[in-house]
Amino acid sequence: MNTVELIKILLEYKPSDILRKRKEELVELIPEFKACFNFDQKSKWHTYDVFEHILHVVDNVDNTPVLRIAALFHDVAKPIVYEEDRFGVGHFPNHWTKSAEIFSEFAIKNNLDNELIEKVNKLIMFHDLNFGRLTEEEKKAIVEALSEEEIELLFKFKKADLLAQNEEYYYLLDDYQKQKENILSKYERSSNEKYHIWFRWSNPIRKS
């Protein structure tokens, strides 16, 4: 398996069937995946091991290169950063950062498109972000970091990720919709503020 073939597989209707059968070839291309096989996440959020969870997310997202590649890499670093607390519960601190690093190394080595690399990295870096807990300042930072199109992609990705987890938490899908609407409203407000600033500048109050 080479990079071109991998991307072709990712754009199939159900890539998981092929990737499951050819997982050893996937490891030859991206060695970090080997540790994901049968890796028990020991978390109430998850019913699948890391690799199976990744495959389900890959199937769940729309078959575009950005979403499918982001899905493949988004949790690849989980076994690397894994920590277990005294209750035997698994945690994966900053796995998004390490996963983005692994993707970036792969992407640069294989000369992937710069725009694609940037979009995939953003999805990986923000996929686990709890938008419901963000302060107004943090929401403002998100608006500056991501375009409206990228927010739409991110929430598609987050929904696909949730649907590959424990069914008990599917109720959060409604929360995701509200969170998306809330963050998108910040773009409208930001645009309106910019418009009013421009209007005042371009249409100064004339003296009588």
Where are the model-predicted features located?
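Divalent metal-dependent catalytic cores for phosphoryl transfer on phosphate-bearing substrates
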Residues: 59-167
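Charged substrate- and nucleic-acid-binding regions of tRNA-handling and nucleotidyl-transfer enzymes
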Residues: 1, 6, 150-208
